[in-house]
């Protein structure tokens, strides 16, 4: 059985995601291949609240070609590229069933990513760039370019290393190689104009109280079934699109209450002082990327400490968000060969608390992240405990 692993956020699910799934199956050469996605939960990689709850996004995906959806724990989902990629790739690997890894790429020559995956950044160049005030992604790109000695066009290498999606793709490859996963890797060029960012922009332009306004904006860029899931969930008042402004206002209040921010994850290099001085106003700066600022704020809001991020490098469980009929069979096989506990319901974690303190710490961080999300999406606190896996036929 071929099982294609896909790392995604589905924020929200759009036509580009559907295209990637169909292309992955074509490249694998098996239209019946199982598609397993590991996806972000309440917070996404760039540090923001997801546009809709994870169970809604999982259902969108399951009705559009995904067979099994599992959740990437908060500590990896809301993290820099390397940590995000490493956590997601390892989670797919530890299911024991994934054979292939597919992801989208933006670069003109995807093969350059395989070559760059073997290049280690020049540490001296990295340190110098950081000391000169460059953001970490920019400094890392400079250090990679300096260390690269291959035959590709230097301008192509430079352009590739300055594209966020290419950096993510590069980190997927690096993680898969480092872990000796044996995954067959499929890099799929993205279709122009199809991105979650463009979908969210259209959503922001719509009258969020009007289903017809939202439908008009998103028709054609979200698959019909995925759009239907989002609209029906909003109309039934299962959630409201998260109120980012209220979230940031509460973050500002917390900053004023906290005497020391430096212990929270991603608050190093003077970011704590910058946030304290600017949280109520303009957070744009050339020294820190917005994703890093948002991840630091998310860590503060959830209580995630820098020491925890430093110590915990591995996912401790496989949280199942949903599955199709084909996915049900895959999960049955997973139950025999997975190298992590499988949690179909939140209550499954409680049985492992006493014997696995690392699982307890990671799961309780997830619970808190979910409750914070619920606060800004008009959802019930503790909804995670009442959330069974989504099942679609």
Protein language model regions, located:
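N-terminal cationic-hydrophobic initiation segments that often serve targeting/anchoring roles
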Residues: 25-29, 62, 92-93, 177
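Active-site cores that bind ATP or allylic diphosphates and position pyrophosphate for catalysis
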Residues: 71-393
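A glycine-rich helix N-cap at a beta->alpha junction
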Residues: 58-73
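Conserved acidic residues
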Residues: 2, 33, 67, 98-99
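N-terminal catalytic cores of NTP/NDP-binding nucleotidyl/phosphoryl-transfer enzymes
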Residues: 1-57
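Acidic, Ser/Thr-rich peripheral helices and adjacent loops at domain boundaries
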Residues: 56-59, 124-125
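Generic structural signal for well-ordered secondary structure
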Residues: 50-54, 62, 81, 85
């Amino acid at each position: 059985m071929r099982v294609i692993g896909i790392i995604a956020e589905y924020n929200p699910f759009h036509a580009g995601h559907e295209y990637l799934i169909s292309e992955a199956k074509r490249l694998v050469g098996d239209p019946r291949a199982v598609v397993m996605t590991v996806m972000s939960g309440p917070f996404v990689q760039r540090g923001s609240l997801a546009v809709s709850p994870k169970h809604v996004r999982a259902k969108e995906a399951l009705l559009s070609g995904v067979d099994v959806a599992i959740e990437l724990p908060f500590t990896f989902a809301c993290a820099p590229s390397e940590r995000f990629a490493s956590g997601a790739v390892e989670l797919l690997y530890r299911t024991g069933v994934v054979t292939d890894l597919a992801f989208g790429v933006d670069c003109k020559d995807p093969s350059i990513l395989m070559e760059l995956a073997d290049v280690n950044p020049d540490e001296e160049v990295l340190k110098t760039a950081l000391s000169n005030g460059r953001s970490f992604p920019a400094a890392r790109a400079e250090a990679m370019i300096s260390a690269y000695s291959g035959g590709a066009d230097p301008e192509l290498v430079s352009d590739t290393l300055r594209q966020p999606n290419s950096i993510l793709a590069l980190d997927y490859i690096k993680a898969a190689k480092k872990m000796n996963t044996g995954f067959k890797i499929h890099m799929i060029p993205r279709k122009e104009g199809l991105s979650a960012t463009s979908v969210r922009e259209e959503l922001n332009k719509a009258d969020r109280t009007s289903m017809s306004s939202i439908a008009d904006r998103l028709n054609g860029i979200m698959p019909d079934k995925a759009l239907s899931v989002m609209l029906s969930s909003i109309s039934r008042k299962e959630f409201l699109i998260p109120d980012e402004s209220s979230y940031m206002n509460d973050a500002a209040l917390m900053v004023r209450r906290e005497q020391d921010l430096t212990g929270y994850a991603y608050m190093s290099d003077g970011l704590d002082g910058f946030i304290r001085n600017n949280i109520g106003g303009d957070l744009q700066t050339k020294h820190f990327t917005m994703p890093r600022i948002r991840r630091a704020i998310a860590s503060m809001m959830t209580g995630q400490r820098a020491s925890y991020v430093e110590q915990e490098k591995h996912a401790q469980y496989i949280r199942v968000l949903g599955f199709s009929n084909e996915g049900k069979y895959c999960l049955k096989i997973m139950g025999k060969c997975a190298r992590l506990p499988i949690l179909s319901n939140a209550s499954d974690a409680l049985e492992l608390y006493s014997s696995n303190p690392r699982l307890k710490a990671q799961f309780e961080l997830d619970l808190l992240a979910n409750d914070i999300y619920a606060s800004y999406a008009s959802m019930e606190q503790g909804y995670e405990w009442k959330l069974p896996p989504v099942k679609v036929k």
